[in-house]
Structure formats: C-alpha cells, structure tokens
Amino acid sequence: MTRTGQILFIQGGGAGAHDEWDDKLVESLRRELGGEYEVRYPRMPDEGDPCYARWSTAIRREMAALDDGAVVVGHSVGAAILLNALAGRPPEKGLGAIVLIAAPFVGEGGWLSDEFELTSDLGAKLPPGAQADVFHGLRDETAPPSHAACMPRPSRRRGCTSCPGGIIS
C-alpha cells in the first residue's frame, strides 16, 4: 500500500511515557490507519523532566523533515509544547492538521511554568490553514476539561471533543 501522508506524534512527559503510555496511542493509530500514513514517533529528550527548550528544539527538527500537509499530534505536556513551538516559529511547510490530546493549558487558570505560557493571542500565531482539533477526557485530573476552555483558538479550530473518562482507558 502506498502511504498517502505523515503524522508526527509528540509524546507526553513523565518517566516511561514513550514506551509505557503513549506507545499504546501510537500503535492504535497505526493499526487503525493500516499503513496508509507514516506515523513518526520520536522519543523526546529527558522525558521524565520535560524542558521547553529541549523539547521544542526536537519538535522543530522533526517538523522540518515532514512533507507538506502532514498532521501533528501532541499528547499532554507534549501538546502544550508543540502548540507553543508552532506559534513561536511555524514550520516552513504547511500542516494538514493540529491535534491536541489531553493538552494542559499553561498559564493563568492552568499549569504554571517558568519556561513558557500559552497566551490568549497564540491562536493567531499558529500556522495558517491547519485545522485544529482538541480532545479532553471528562475525568482527566491532570489536564482537566476546564483547560480546553482556556486554550488559544486557532483560526481554523474544528472543535473540542470531550471523551468519557480519560483519553486512554
């Protein structure tokens, strides 16, 4: 089967997140897509202690290798860092979509960070043309659904989907 597109999946943070948590999401994605897409799943540096500078550098490096129209997916803290990295320096090639799963809002009303903050004007700084989808679990205590209301709104946000329970059951 010929692959028709690419998906870059950015993991969440925490010790073992790449191999013991997000790998389940990625394997499910690969299984459902049946090889139609190349799913890239890089290990982020020092996953047990996510650092915006290191992770955003790694994310930008991965995005530079993508084809035009690729889809980027971020989970948890990976989604927050991805969103801020996209707004700070959009990729040269166009994105097909931005998907945020259990993304915490970083800033007033959400998680606090000394490294970065998701500002209210961030949505206007995201790559033009890419549609954005946000998914939150209704019982997610780490990144609760209230964070979705605080998220910056990209110009082409398709919606925010609430899922019963957590994202991963």
Which residues are covered by each model-predicted region?
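Short, surface-exposed "cap/lid" segments of acyl-processing enzymes
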Residues: 2-48
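A short, hydrophobic beta-strand element of the alpha/beta-hydrolase
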Residues: 9, 98-101, 163
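Histidine-bearing beta->alpha loop at or near hydrolase active sites
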Residues: 46, 164-169
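Conserved alpha/beta-hydrolase fold motif
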Residues: 72-73, 98
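Gly/Ala-rich beta-loop-alpha elbow adjacent to hydrolase catalytic centers
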Residues: 73-83
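A conserved short beta-strand
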Residues: 92-106
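Short beta-strand/loop motif that positions the catalytic acidic residue
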Residues: 128, 133-136, 140
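Conserved alpha/beta-hydrolase "acid-adjacent" motif
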Residues: 141-147
